[in-house]
UniProtKB/Swiss-Prot annotation:
<dbReference type="GO" id="GO:0098978">
    <property type="term" value="C:glutamatergic synapse"/>
</dbReference>
<feature type="disulfide bond">
    <location>
        <begin position="306"/>
        <end position="315"/>
    </location>
</feature>
<dbReference type="GO" id="GO:0000978">
    <property type="term" value="F:RNA polymerase II cis-regulatory region sequence-specific DNA binding"/>
</dbReference>
<dbReference type="GO" id="GO:0060252">
    <property type="term" value="P:positive regulation of glial cell proliferation"/>
</dbReference>
<dbReference type="GO" id="GO:0006930">
    <property type="term" value="P:substrate-dependent cell migration, cell extension"/>
</dbReference>
<feature type="disulfide bond">
    <location>
        <begin position="406"/>
        <end position="423"/>
    </location>
</feature>
<feature type="disulfide bond">
    <location>
        <begin position="343"/>
        <end position="368"/>
    </location>
</feature>
<feature type="domain" description="Laminin EGF-like 1">
    <location>
        <begin position="285"/>
        <end position="340"/>
    </location>
</feature>
<feature type="domain" description="Laminin EGF-like 2">
    <location>
        <begin position="341"/>
        <end position="403"/>
    </location>
</feature>
<dbReference type="InterPro" id="IPR008993">
    <property type="entry name" value="TIMP-like_OB-fold"/>
</dbReference>
<keyword id="KW-0424">Laminin EGF-like domain</keyword>
<dbReference type="GO" id="GO:0045773">
    <property type="term" value="P:positive regulation of axon extension"/>
</dbReference>
<keyword id="KW-1015">Disulfide bond</keyword>
<dbReference type="Pfam" id="PF01759">
    <property type="entry name" value="NTR"/>
</dbReference>
<feature type="disulfide bond">
    <location>
        <begin position="285"/>
        <end position="294"/>
    </location>
</feature>
<feature type="glycosylation site" description="N-linked (GlcNAc...) asparagine">
    <location>
        <position position="131"/>
    </location>
</feature>
<keyword id="KW-0053">Apoptosis</keyword>
Length: 604
């Protein structure tokens, strides 16, 4: 009898140790209490800090699903007591239809009054290999500190505690109790717990004695003996280990006196059953340090009241638009709050990029999506193409970017300088939007060269007045009538340009023409640019009108690359093709240009 008393005291001491650990014992830092504060998730300066929900008995008042309950149909059961060496049995009736004689599962999680014990009770003699299970759904993820059961019957000889992290879809062992660990659960007896296996269930024979015959306690501490418990904040393994959505207790084997097979075995078997007065699951609503309480949502589901810009049932992700750094669990040192993306008020959505986060020294990884108000960039921090910054407004202003409004004819593109708004103008065009001709230029009818240089009067010794030599017929044949331009002629020449003859000067055996190159349709190896340039033609070619050129006229010139006298400009000779320009040729020459890029000239 004294032994039973001492065991009961030891069991109560174990529960007291658990409660003491919950209140601040070493290795259970995640369950440390906090002093009352106006806002437990912020310090006195308003800075975020870790906050955790209150410690509760998560089983209290919840329904427990059991695989066996006495009373359907009504059945006799006998309670064994001992007086010295004598065993006494007092028999009663379990009747589920009579509230005074029923032992329903609700008694497992009701208010436990030691002066008026209420006990759930199984059917009689459900012995191994049959088992009896108690399944408790917590309603959401909890970080469990302990699971305890107080018995009205003798404690089981073998029992297992399981947990689920996915609302009962899968189960993993939490703890085993048995005098025959290897036989019952294929586990070694009291295996040492190391850092390598601290997330695994162990089997022990503690709390498996048959006595006391009533009032015995089994209490399992989830972190007791786990090596990383002292550094719980930095141990994802143990954080996962204590997490559960459901708890299941499986009673595998009854303790007996060995009289179940004797002559009065029916009376003996009616004395063996499982009966529990109290099932407790001590722990906290799992909120990863980002909430101080759990509340019911619109669907009446239990969820964390998330802070620190977090979201989710367990505050296990960042809320929308707060992806500038990755989600992390809060610790005693760092709140690890989620940070909003910096989009300068021009975007409503963003995403996280780990590569950018690493490159920033782990400070910022947010990338803004769908920038509005004509902005662009990772942070919507510059103006998109076709717009420029209005420096009189902050970048966060809705009208911080102004349209370039580049002239459709005078500008060479739609993109302007991001700072000044200056559009890229074509040759001879000026103005911030390229809307007027520059000094010394006049407007033309060509959309390609809308501004051309104002012509200069030809010199007194004009190229057209040169006397024709007598041997021109044998030297070259001047073109007569209309010349046609085709792909074959285009491919044979090194360059093809549209020119405007401005003036001509005699330079020894050469004529130097100052021309304005309006368009370049082919340039070969020589880099020919639009604008003013020199055209060199030998005097004899000009005298024989090969080619025939007049000042102030526009021509299509197709020629071959040749060094000019001053190493600049282009050279034409009797083999060059010079045709007075027609605006209808522009489209044809652009087609030739495209075909050349596709390699058609090689086949021509």
């Amino acid at each position: 009898m004294m032994r039973a008393v001492w065991e009961a005291l030891a069991a109560l001491a174990a529960v007291a140790c658990l409660v003491g650990a919950v209140r601040g014992g070493p290795g259970l830092s995640m369950f440390a209490g906090q002093a009352a504060q106006p806002d437990p998730c912020s310090d006195e300066n308003g800075h975020p800090r870790r906050c955790i929900p209150d410690f509760v008995n998560a089983a209290f008042g919840k329904d427990v699903r059991v695989s066996s309950t006495c009373g359907r149909p009504p059945a006799r059961y006998c309670v064994v007591s001992e007086r010295g060496e004598e065993r006494l049995r007092s028999c009663h009736l379990c009747n589920a239809s009579d509230p005074k004689k029923a032992h329903p599962p609700a008694f497992l999680t009701d208010l436990n009054n030691p002066h008026n014990l209420t006990c759930w009770q199984s059917e009689n003699y459900l012995q191994f290999p049959h088992n009896v299970t108690l399944t408790l759904s917590l309603g959401k993820k909890f970080e469990v500190t302990y699971v305890s059961l107080q018995f009205c019957s003798p404690r089981p000889e073998s029992m297992a505690i399981y947990k689920s992290m996915d609302y009962g879809r899968t189960w993993v062992p939490f703890q085993f109790y048995s005098t025959q660990c290897r036989k019952m659960y294929n586990r070694p007896h009291r295996a040492p717990i190391t850092k390598q296996n601290e997330q695994e269930a162990v089997c022990t024979d503690s709390h498996t004695d048959m006595r006391p015959l009533s009032g015995g306690l089994i209490a399992f501490s989830t972190l007791d003996g786990r090596p990383s418990a002292h550094d719980f904040d930095n141990s994802p393994v143990l954080q996962d280990w204590v997490t559960a959505t459901d708890i299941r207790v499986a009673f595998s084997r009854l303790h007996t006196f060995g009289d179940e097979n004797e002559d009065d075995s029916e009376l003996a078997r009616d004395s063996y059953f499982y009966a529990v007065s109290d099932l407790q699951v001590g722990g906290r609503c799992k909120c990863n340090g980002h909430a101080a309480r759990c509340v019911r949502d619109r669907d009446d589901s239990l969820v964390c009241d998330c802070r620190h810009n977090t979201a989710g049932p367990e505050c296990d992700r960042c809320k929308p638009f707060h992806y500038d750094r990755p989600w992390q669990r809060a610790t005693a040192r760092e709140a690890n709050e989620c940070v909003a993306c910096n989009c300068n008020l021009h975007a409503r959505r963003c995403r996280f990029n780990m590569e950018l986060y690493k490159l920033s020294g782990r400070k910022s990884g947010g990338v803004c999506l769908n920038c509005r108000h004509n902005t662009a960039g990772r942070h919507c921090h510059y103006c998109k193409e076709g717009y420029y910054r209005d420096m009189g407004k902050p970048i966060t202003h809705r009208k911080a970017c102004k349209a370039c409004d580049c002239h459709p004819v005078g500008a060479a593109g739609k993109t302007c300088n991001q700072t000044t708004g200056q559009c890229p103008c074509k040759d001879g065009v000026t103005g911030i939007t390229c809307n007027r001709c520059a000094k010394g230029y006049q407007q033309s009818r060509s959309p390609i060269a809308p501004c051309i240089k104002i012509p200069v009067a030809p010199p007194t010794t004009a190229a057209s007045s040169v006397e024709e030599p007598e041997d021109c017929d044998s030297y070259c044949k001047a073109s007569k009538g209309k010349l046609k331009i085709n792909m074959k002629k285009y491919c044979k020449k090194d360059y093809a340009v549209q020119i405007h003859i401005l003036k001509a000067d005699k330079a020894g055996d050469w004529w130097k023409f100052t021309v304005n190159i309006i368009s370049v349709y082919k340039q070969g190896t020589s880099r020919i640019r639009r604008g003013d340039q020199s055209l060199w033609i030998r005097s004899r070619d000009i005298a024989c009108k090969c080619p025939k050129i007049k000042p102030l006229k526009k021509y299509l010139l197709l020629g071959n690359a040749e060094d000019s006298p001053d190493q600049s400009g282009i050279v034409a000779d009797k083999s060059s093709l010079v045709i007075q320009w027609r605006d209808t040729w522009a489209r044809r020459l652009r087609k030739f240009q495209q075909r050349e890029k596709k390699g058609k000239c090689k086949k021509a």
